[in-house]
């Protein structure tokens, strides 16, 4: 996880195309300039970055389901709940599942756990569009390889 670059995903643990679900793992860095202000003497992962982490996990699920052919963009967040704090150095297990799609939008349900304890969850809405340019397509394909997105020909389904 590289907070300053909003790169929230470390690795794909499982991509189940048939079950329309993904599991991701990410470690919150032990140190980051973000923690200098959130909060001095008691560093906590900001809720907005936890939401971004769930959105990115959902995005990788949708990219997988679309075989990296179209780009999901976050369009809405509903029912976000934060149940406890996330501290530097903790390992996050992020799960996202497709809830429904239609009318040009897709909805996922995502949650984050630390040590098998749920820390937050949300319903996330995405608009899926063609890639805006070849640079974005290349970046997504390179990132997919870096985080270990399974070959889409062999991924669980």
PLM feature spans:
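Short aromatic-glycine motifs in intrinsically disordered, low-complexity regions
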Residues: 1-3, 67
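Catalytic strand-loop segment that frames the active site of acyl-thioester-processing enzymes
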Residues: 4-45
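Hydrophobic core residues within well-ordered beta-strands of beta-rich domains
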Residues: 6-8, 92, 106
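Conserved positions in beta-strands of structured domains
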Residues: 10-13, 78, 83, 97-99, ...
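HotDog/MaoC-like acyl-thioester-processing domains
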Residues: 21, 88, 97-157
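Short, hydrophobic/aromatic-enriched beta-strand segments in well-ordered soluble domains
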Residues: 26, 95-98
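Compact, glycine-rich, soluble single-domain proteins
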Residues: 38-46, 50-60, 74
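Hydrophobic beta-strand-centered segment that forms part of the acyl-chain substrate-binding groove
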Residues: 57-93, 119-123, 127-129
């Amino acid at each position: 996880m590289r907070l300053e670059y909003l790169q929230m995903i470390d690795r794909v643990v499982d991509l189940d195309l048939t079950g329309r679900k993904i599991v991701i793992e990410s470690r919150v860095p032990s140190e980051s300039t973000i923690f200098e202000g959130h909060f001095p003497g008691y560093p906590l992962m900001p809720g907005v970055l936890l939401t971004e982490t769930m959105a990115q996990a959902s995005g990788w699920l949708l990219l997988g389901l679309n075989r990296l052919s179209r780009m999901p963009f976050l369009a809405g967040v509903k029912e976000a709940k934060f149940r406890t704090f996330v501290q530097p150095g903790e390992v996050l297990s992020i799960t996202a599942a497709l809830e429904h799609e239609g009318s040009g939008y897709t909805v996922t349900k995502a949650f984050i756990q630390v040590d098998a304890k749920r820390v937050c969850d949300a319903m996330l809405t995405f608009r899926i569009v063609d890639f805006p340019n070849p640079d974005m397509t290349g970046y997504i394909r390179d990132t997919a390889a870096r985080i270990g997105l399974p070959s889409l020909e062999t991924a669980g389904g």
